[in-house]
């Protein structure tokens, strides 16, 4: 048992990537952080850091679309959602789209470190722009962790990465739904995360409806047992891919609880983390 194969008694699953042997340097303003199994992620030391919301989006999408051969991650940032999905779907080919050059550069370093460059394409640009995604490009699984708030709805960070991850600078939940609907393969699945408060939930539902999507399942996420859900995970499919009788229903799953009342990690969330190659 050593630090390369284990972490606090937990055996790291999955393939061992080339890592730093691929001649990649960790710059002073960067960190290199463990994600799934032996995969790692380059992040800015003082920039946007991956979150529980990102982790859950990847888990939800790959759990309910486990046989995907092609996948698209919208607004992919530094690559958290896409990298975890790629770890869980080792045979799938990925396209990710991100508008910020600095985040794209970090994601490319991570893809190289993790040895997935041949099946993981990172495109720089606004996913709403017609030149970014061809009309004929279709994907079995599409994921998105969109910004939650319109500009002016809260205190805005001065850091470009943090600002774009929180506020709707380039599209909102409706744009994510519209793009997903255009690029889902027949029977494809779109997974995203968004606030669960009533007004925000209404935005998800309106965006899905306008795009011709059906929210086939959703799961509220409670960060502390006993509290109200702060975010929800949503799984959508195109209405045209479903029988008419099914299009008007959504299965609401039990709350996913992150921490118990005492502050310990909830047993189910520990199991979720194990499923995506994280220590419990």
Predicted regions and their residues:
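N-terminal auxiliary segments of SAM/dcSAM-dependent transferases
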Residues: 1-29
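SAM-dependent Rossmann-like transferase core, predominantly class I methyltransferases
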Residues: 23-70, 76-87, 235, 248-251, ...
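General small-molecule cofactor/ligand-binding pocket signal
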Residues: 42, 95, 121-123, 216-219
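Residue-level signal for inorganic ion chemistry
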Residues: 57, 145, 176, 236
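Conserved SAM/SAH cofactor-binding pocket of Class I
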Residues: 59-144, 150-155
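Mobile active-site "lid"/loop adjacent to the S-adenosyl-L-methionine
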Residues: 146-176
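Conserved Class I SAM-dependent methyltransferase catalytic core
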Residues: 169-225, 229
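SAM/dcSAM-binding transferase cores
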Residues: 228-280
């Amino acid at each position: 048992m050593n630090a390369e194969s284990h972490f606090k008694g937990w055996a790291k699953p999955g393939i061992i990537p080339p890592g730093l042997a691929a001649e990649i340097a960790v710059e002073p303003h960067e960190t290199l952080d463990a994600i799934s199994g032996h995969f790692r992620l380059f992040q800015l030391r003082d920039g946007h850091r991956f979150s529980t919301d990102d982790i859950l989006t990847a888990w939800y999408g790959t759990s309910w679309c486990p046989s995907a051969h092609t996948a698209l991650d919208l607004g992919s940032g530094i690559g958290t959602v896409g990298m975890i999905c790629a770890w869980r779907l080792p045979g799938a080919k990925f396209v990710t789209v991100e508008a910020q050059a600095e985040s794209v550069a970090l994601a490319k370093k991570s893809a190289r470190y993790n040895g997935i460059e041949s099946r993981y394409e990172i495109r720089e640009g606004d996913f709403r722009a017609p030149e970014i995604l061809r009309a004929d490009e279709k994907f079995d699984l599409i994921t998105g962790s969109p910004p939650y708030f319109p500009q002016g709805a809260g205190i805005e960070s001065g850091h470009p990465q943090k600002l774009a991850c929180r506020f709707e600078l380039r599209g909102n939940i409706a744009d994510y739904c519209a793009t997903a609907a255009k690029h889902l393969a027949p029977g494809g699945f779109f997974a995203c995360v968004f606030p669960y408060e009533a007004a925000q939930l209404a935005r998800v539902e309106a965006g899905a409806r306008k795009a011709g999507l059906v929210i086939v399942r959703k799961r509220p996420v409670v960060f502390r047992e006993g509290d109200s859900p702060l975010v929800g995970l949503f799984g959508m499919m195109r209405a045209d891919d479903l029988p008419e009788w099914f299009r008007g229903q959504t299965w609401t799953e039990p709350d996913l609880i992150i921490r118990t009342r005492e502050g310990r990690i909830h047993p189910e969330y520990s199991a979720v983390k194990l499923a995506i190659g994280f220590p419990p």
